[in-house]
Amino acid sequence: MDEDQSSEQPGSSIPEGSEFLFDPAEFGEEAVEEATRGESAFRSIAKSRAETTPEPPHQICKIRLANILGFVDSTVYPDRFTVMVGANNSGKSSLMRAVGFAQTLLRVHVEREEDTKVVLARGRNLGDPLLPVPEVRDLWHQGIRRKGNEWVMAEIEIEFEDGLQIGFGMKGPFGHATSRLLDDSYREIPREIFDRLTSYPIVYVPSSVGVVDREEYRTPARILSLIAGGRAHEVLRNLLLDLEEEGRLNEVADVIAEYFSGTIDQVSFEPSIDEYIHVSYKEDSDHDLFSAGAGFLQVLQLVTFLVHERPGILMVDEPDAHLHSSLQRLVVDVLRRASQDLGIQVLLATHSKEIINYVDPSELLVIDRHEKELRGLGQHEGAISVLESLGSIDSVDAYEIINQRRLLLVGIGGSQDPSGASRQARQSSVRGRRSSGGDRDWW
């Protein structure tokens, strides 16, 4: 059950005067108690950041995509910690790329910055390197940029929890893309809100495995290009070198040490004599980073992105790939802890039944690019309590039920017998999973 739905007030047992860098009501009593047992490395990082950027990061509450990256017209409602699931080509990665693209468009549209506000340009031409696709036509649903005499508008609109909205529409005349604001009301953004957006950026971490055996020094522009191209594992040492030069490598090392017996020990590069960046980790003795295990490297990459990029919204694409089940659970633990202690939003895409079964059903959100509205299970009123009553229904069952859309969970009118409700709901769920027809009922 979602702890926010507890009958007790979240945070009610917190000692007076305690300081929190995330809202206790957002995560519930259990999460708060866990966070107070000892200060985590993430929490230490959050305290340090609060000295320079006291305002908390933004959280996305609504994403609308129309005629873009395979989406016809869908509105997605993510939570603070959301595990996105769905079939191949359902749109999980496309959704993440679209959100990242919206951030790019916001920066491109900045016309001028004033003391109290930032003014956006109504329209901009977009160069190919700015697009999240190899070819311009790939941005549009089925590559259709024109119908008859009308150019088709590809649209992205995002709403944040504080009411801020931004929206962009793209057209593709003459083989290139142009962008315009969807509404003139989006032209002016209060300065303090814009600064929060840029201080805590949206960061997309593509799926990757391991590291390359040798890594050359890269320029910042080349690093961004490789990450955008899904080759983040090729620049991990470069990011660690940046942190070493900034005096922040210890932040990564401290987090890693909480989860593994070894941690990052040394990062070095001398331009006059070195061709490659050297990174070692210490576990009894020093070892080259290339010899580390897959789980260590995956967690190291995620933590490095969290420290280096300072995201307010972290989007992670299949971080479980090729990992043992226990390491998949560890990745979820690290991301959930980061969300809680750093106060950031995490969107995680996965195919892993291990992860689906490990997380709370309320954290699941099934992505289907052909559906009009996409909400997490926790946003469907009453669904969690009914699922709880089923006992043996786990998150994998919940995912299959949602994905098939064959289950109608309803209150048992006039019944005060929980076991009766559970029995009827269980029978409905069995019929739901086995049925191949019937109405497509939603919660």
Stretches found by the model and what they are:
Residues 71, 159-163, 261, 282-284:
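Glycine-centered tight beta-turn/hairpin loop motif at sheet-sheet or coil-to-beta transitions
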Residues 404-443:
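Conserved helicase/translocase motor-coupling segment
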Residues 198-202, 311, 360-362, 404, ...:
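Short glycine-/polar-rich loops that comprise or flank the Walker A/P-loop
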Residues 98-165, 268:
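Conserved P-loop NTP-binding catalytic core
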